[in-house]
């Protein structure tokens, strides 16, 4: 799935480039849009009593992004093991295709009690969709 973010003036730093912390925010925006597109908005999942915290984030910065640039973020499910999953992101200039950053974020599914949630049992439709997405990505490789 592709998500477009237009770099905002308030996201720039003293050097006139997008501050590195904003790429992490863009990843979250793109991840939320990705889950919406799959038919499982975060709100719907949380209403079912399941939360999905971030376990880790890793981002490699390749080229600078400036105010007004439009960045296309390609979002893919890169692994899914029932409770834990990882999402990969490629952030490219929308016009030139230049790679600006590549990143991953790791997450898990927990019940509101903070314990791992068996979504295969508790949200079987989400589990099936995640498995379908993973198979789609594996076929592309």
Map each language-model feature to its residues.
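Terminal targeting signals and extreme-terminal segments of soluble enzymes
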Residues: 1-72, 80-141
